[in-house]
Amino acid sequence: MELRDIEIFLMLAEELHFGRTAERLRVSQARVSQAIRKQERRIGAALFERTSRTVRLTDVGRQLRDDLQPVYAGLHDSLERARLAARGVTGRLRVGMMPFNLADLHFYWKEFRSRYPQWELEVRQMVYTDPFGRLRNGELDVLVVWLPVEEPDFTVGPVMLTDPRIVAVTADHELAQRTSVRLEMFADFLHTMPPDVPDYWEDGYLPFHTPRGRTIERGRPVTNAEELINQVGMGEIIHGFPSHVTRHWGMPNIRWIPVPDLATLSYALVWRTDAENEPIRALADTVRELGTFRF
C-alpha cells in the first residue's frame, strides 16, 4: 500500500466524509474514491459502508485503522524529525484552534517564534469532531478551546481570548430585525452542536436550558463550520457564536445579533498533563506575559 493511499484511508476513517477528506488532503474526491477501491480490492473486503447520506467503517476497516494509525504516526514522526534537524530546528509545537480568528491572535504566534526560533510552531484550524481526541492521540500538543474544560488528564493554561456572544439567523428570520436577543428566546428555535462532545462542554457553549428552564432543542449534529453556517443560511437553525466570526464570514443572507445574557466565551490553552514539555510551557508563559485578547 502506497503512503498516500494510507493517508487517504486514515483521513477518511477520521472524517467519514469523502468531500472533507479530499479538501483536507488537497486532492479530488475521485482520487479518494479510487484509493479506497484499490485498497478494498487488495484486501478483498469492504473497508467502509457507504450510503447516500453516511459513510461508516466496517469491522475490517476499523481493524485496519487501528493497526495502521501507530505505524503511520511513527513513520511520519521520524520523517518530520529528520526534516527539522536538517533545518537546525530542535522541536515542534502543534497548536489546534477552535476559534476562527487566527489573524487576530497572530501577535502571540509572532512573539513565540521570535523568542524561540529553535522550535517550529504549527497552528491549524480544527474541525469540530472530537477535538479532545486529537490531544489524547498525540496529533496536537496544545488546543485553544472554550472553557470550561474538566478532563482529568488535561491541564488548563492561561486564557488567550474572551469574546461576547451573538446569534446568527437568516435575513428573513423573525428575529432578524431585533437589536438584541435574550437567551430565553433560544427555546423557540432549533439549534445544533458537534457530535460526541462532553455534555458539560457543550453546555458551556450553548446551555441545554434557558434561564426559566425551557429546553433548547438540538437538531442533527454538524462536524465543521461550513456545514453549520449553511444550516443557518438555509433557515434550518439559529446558532450562537462568538462575535469574532463576523470578521471572517461576510454573508449577505445572515444577520448577527448580540445576545447580552449568553455568557462570554473564554478560550484557553489546554494540553495533556503527561505530555507537558518545554515548548508548551514557553507558549503558556508567552500568553500570560502578553495578556488576554478581549474581542
Task: Tell where the protein language model's regions lie, with residue ranges.
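N-terminal short secondary-structure element
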Residues: M1-A35
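N-terminal winged-helix
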Residues: Q29-A30, Q34, A73, D77-E80, ...
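A short LG(V/I)-centered, amphipathic sequence patch enriched
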Residues: E40-L57
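Short beta-strand-centered segments that line the small-molecule binding cleft or hinge
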Residues: A85, F107-E111, R115, T129-V169, ...
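C-terminal effector-binding regulatory domain of bacterial HTH transcription factors
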Residues: A86, I229-N230, M234, S243-N253, ...
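Secondary-structure junction motif
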Residues: D104-L105, W146, T179-L183, D188-G213, ...
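Flexible hinge/capping segments at coil-to-helix
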Residues: V156-R165, V169-H191, R281
